[in-house]
């Protein structure tokens, strides 16, 4: 299921905030997000279940939880504004909902950056059929 969602995004030509999130991740980590994070662990990419495999996967778990709290807009598709000032991401705009989405994405990108040293290539294309531990609650 995660694979189909990612492929659909790639084929459609990413619109709205998914492209913005990709740019944030690239800026913070230097990694290509689709290759490095789209299929990482049990939570990066579409959906998630089980227990996060490591700190990077936990970044995705927390990001999913952050999205669950957003109301009034579609976190995956609605466009938001942000800028980069002195290496920091600054979320802007007048819409509180899309600003909240931006803050979720910003926190995840920073989390990825802060956990680069523990990033494990073995989780880069981790099959979700191995995510069998009980699912944690947000």
Curated annotation (Swiss-Prot):
SUPFAM superfamilies referenced in this protein's UniProt entry, alphabetically: Phospholipase A2, PLA2
GO cellular component: extracellular region
Location relative to the cell: Secreted
Domain of life: Eukaryota
Disulfide-bonded cysteines: 42-131, 44-60, 59-111, 65-138, 66-104, 73-97, 91-102
Record Gene3D superfamilies: Phospholipase A2 domain
One GO MF term: calcium-dependent phospholipase A2 activity
Alphabetical list of InterPro entries matching this protein: PLipase_A2, PLipase_A2_Asp_AS, PLipase_A2_dom, PLipase_A2_dom_sf, PLipase_A2_His_AS
Active site: 63, 105
EC number(s) per entry: 3.1.1.4
Enzyme class: hydrolase
Recorded catalytic activity of this chain's protein: a 1,2-diacyl-sn-glycero-3-phosphocholine + H2O = a 1-acyl-sn-glycero-3-phosphocholine + a fatty acid + H(+)
A Pfam family of this chain: Phospholip_A2_1
GO biological process entries: arachidonate secretion; lipid catabolic process; negative regulation of T cell proliferation; phospholipid metabolic process
Family per record: Belongs to the phospholipase A2 family. Group II subfamily. D49 sub-subfamily.
Protein name: Basic phospholipase A2 PL-X'
Organism: Protobothrops flavoviridis
Taxonomic path: Eukaryota, Metazoa, Chordata, Craniata, Vertebrata
